Amino acid sequence: MVCEGKRSTSCPCFFLLTAKFYWILTMMQRTHSQEYAHSIRLDGDIILGGLFPVHAKGERGVPCGDLKKEKGIHRLEAMLYAIDQINKDPDLLSNITLGVRILDTCSRDTYALEQSLTFVQALIEKDASDVKCANGDPPIFTKPDKISGVIGAAASSVSIMVANILRLFKIPQISYASTAPELSDNTRYDFFSRVVPPDSYQAQAMVDIVTALGWNYVSTLASEGNYGESGVEAFTQISREIGGVCIAQSQKIPREPRPGEFEKIIKRLLETPNARAVIMFANEDDIRRILEAAKKLNQSGHFLWIGSDSWGSKIAPVYQQEEIAEGAVTILPKRASIDGFDRYFRSRTLANNRRNVWFAEFWEENFGCKLGSHGKRNSHIKKCTGLERIARDSSYEQEGKVQFVIDAVYSMAYALHNMHKELCPGYIGLCPRMVTIDGKELLGYIRAVNFNGSAGTPVTFNENGDAPGRYDIFQYQINNKSTEYKIIGHWTNQLHLKVEDMQWANREHTHPASVCSLPCKPGERKKTVKGVPCCWHCERCEGYNYQVDELSCELCPLDQRPNINRTGCQRIPIIKLEWHSPWAVVPVFIAILGIIATTFVIVTFVRYNDTPIVRASGRELSYVLLTGIFLCYSITFLMIAAPDTIICSFRRIFLGLGMCFSYAALLTKTNRIHRIFEQGKKSVTAPKFISPASQLVITFSLISVQLLGVFVWFVVDPPHTIIDYGEQRTLDPENARGVLKCDISDLSLICSLGYSILLMVTCTVYAIKTRGVPETFNEAKPIGFTMYTTCIIWLAFIPIFFGTAQSAEKMYIQTTTLTVSMSLSASVSLGMLYMPKVYIIIFHPEQNVQKRKRSFKAVVTAATMQSKLIQKGNDRPNGEVKSELCESLETNTSSTKTTYISYSNHSI
């Protein structure tokens, strides 16, 4: 304000502020006005505010520090460049000039808040009724600029602080660099928009990168503040939602770290050595100091850095720390270098850029010189000539956010342009409706803009004021002592990554691992650690289980076993008893010998059918018995043959039939002998049914019971084959086999043989009863010896057969035991009953002659005398009894000796 009267620059004005807020504002404007230039001010019809980090943070007690050439001056000049371009464009805001009021935030949120109060001065009503000049005249106030919109700020923490003030006064704000997800909250920051995507998109891209590289165990590192903490929070939330990525630990870098703080952070990160990947949402200075600490602790090649856009493709954080940073994957919003700005900025000089109040300071910093006696550089520095040129006498590279600053300014300009078209149709310049711009109405136009930005990409906003996510993905690589940030992919709602272009420490192209637990081998399932789904122990799927998925094993079906990797099931091999097996060779050999011997006996008996020995043996029952013996040998071949329906049918029929033939014939013989001698003790009348025809009827009646039982078995359970997978289901699935066999259970087998065993036992009983019959009269004793031996064989068979029920060799042992037992039984019968007769027929034909027949009366006499002498047997030796019986018989019959008894005509 100025006072009328004396027009001197030192006109004293005394006034009393009626608003404390305004007093604070005024004092703030004067603070450090001598040390730092306050702002850039360009007049125009519509004034836009600008917030840029021209200076870094100052030390304690000092708000501002060193000049930031790129982030400060480059971005600031980008806004001025955009304003110039818009004001020169006849098609954009024609006849309307944009002005600016640009302030320095000094990279500090609290200082930026103080500065931003400048933007709301015009909206604060002031009561100056009590303010008087020294001469009593009322003061004249300089009218503050009415700010229609604000471009900025850069840091998310600064934008959040400023947005809280601007929303109260309904001033739209467009940021060119703030990416904190918190700013997407349209209920709290409803007047905030941005031309850069929020960190939620960036976090999604980083999660996709981590997932694509197969990393599931990572640590996070954030600078304290909205940018770092919100970015890490977004990454954590997204990784939790999609699953598959676990956070080993989260570290935070304090705003004002103590000495040694960064070394402590690195050591804490090393406590989880498997979490090599580190997700970084940190500012540039913190990134540099973290890399320094890692280098100091000699951790080159250990950490796999994933940096946010604050790292991007900057050289400063990795300068002199290239080996530590090698392989770092960084992300940056897709951008392009603006050629027009390069030409503009290179042409800036001290003479043509006086509107930038910080440009002189930039000039000194950029060229390393001093401007006159008022320069801020030390006195021993060379003086600036003013003839220096940017990019000729100094290095120059366009700062990465220049494109977004220009797009932010153009977004505001297009919104104003569209607003003017609707509110002031056909009006040249500002119409009355736009003299005072309604911020809420302008916000609607901002959110509706859609144009191609300075890089040719569309500029749009969603309902929360966020720009779409478009990122370039870089990797810091070292090749032949040269370094570069190489583009390895991009992200636009989904990841496109060229893994083959990636290079890691020591020039390795195979990407390293960052996992809590190594992948389980095939056939192993994961047993996760409680609360840490990315960490697990591997458990092998044991027995007949196979790996269904990563977390579970399941049992294979009964007819299958796990494959070699236990990742699936395969059919269990089917086996049967093969002819070449040792278990089959021995029974077959015995059976063949037995069949040959039996055939030889039958042929011999047929050849000498009418000789006394054959006739005395009872030809009819002998042939029945020999048939049974033959069948007992033959069953071996049926038991070893490959099972099918026909073979199974024959097995059922002949399994017990051979024994039934044999023991039915023997039982009939022993029963006949027993009845004859028992009848002889009582009377001289011959017992009934002792003729050959009667004997055959009895024998076949006994055999018919077996056949009837087999017939019932056929009806109840038709024969068929099965594959028994339980018989050889060993503990080791590799040895498991399915056994192809007939569906004959052990119980069915016992039932089939049970009747024959019953005949055998009965026959044995009769053999015992007739053991005292004189051997010159009958075959009782050979039959008895046969039955005793047979019983011993079958008593040995039972424990062997049933004792191997759980053995893996069950099929072989049981089949061999059964066939050998039947062959041995047949061999005993053949050897004891017929081989002596064949021997006499072949080698002693002189004994095969007709002897005097014994009448039934002689048998009765022998039986009676035997009965009497048995009573004396208790007092005499066995030999004496036998001798006396023989002598008595010889005297009674007037014969010297009779060896065989004739059964013809009821004689013995």
Swiss-Prot record:
Glycosylation site residues: N95, N298, N452, N480, N565
Any one Gene Ontology BP term: synaptic transmission, glutamatergic
Localization terms from the record: Cell membrane
SUPFAM superfamilies linked to this entry: Periplasmic binding protein-like I
Residues annotated to bind L-glutamate: S156, A177, S178, T179, Y227, D309, K401
Record cross-link Glycyl lysine isopeptide (Lys-Gly) (interchain with G-Cter in SUMO1), residues: K882
Short name of one Pfam family: 7tm_3
Keyword Signal carried by entry: yes
Cytoplasmic side: 609-620, 669-695, 769-781, 844-908
Domain of life of the source: Eukaryota
SS bonds (residue pairs): C64-C106, C246-C534, C369-C384, C424-C431, C516-C535, C520-C538, C541-C553, C556-C569
A single GO cellular-component term on record: synapse
UniProt KW keywords: Cell membrane, Disulfide bond, G-protein coupled receptor, Glycoprotein, Isopeptide bond, Membrane, Receptor, Sensory transduction, Signal, Transducer, Transmembrane, Transmembrane helix, Ubl conjugation
Membrane topology, Extracellular segments: 34-583, 642-647, 717-746, 804-818
Membrane-topology descriptor: Multi-pass membrane protein
Transmembrane parts of this sequence: 584-608, 621-641, 648-668, 696-716, 747-768, 782-803, 819-843
Signal peptide positions (record): 1-33
Mutagenesis or variant effect for K868R: No change in sumoylation. Abolishes sumoylation
GO molecular function: G protein-coupled receptor activity; glutamate receptor activity; group III metabotropic glutamate receptor activity
Tissue expression summary: Strongly expressed in olfactory bulb, accessory olfactory bulb, and mammillary body. Weaker expression in the retina, and in scattered cells in the cortex and hindbrain.
PANTHER family (alphabetical): METABOTROPIC GLUTAMATE RECEPTOR
Purpose of the protein: G-protein coupled receptor for glutamate. Ligand binding causes a conformation change that triggers signaling via guanine nucleotide-binding proteins (G proteins) and modulates the activity of down-stream effectors. Signaling inhibits adenylate cyclase activity.
Record note on quaternary structure: Interacts with PICK1.
Family, per entry: Belongs to the G-protein coupled receptor 3 family.
Name under which the protein is recorded: Metabotropic glutamate receptor 8
Originating organism: Mus musculus (Mouse)
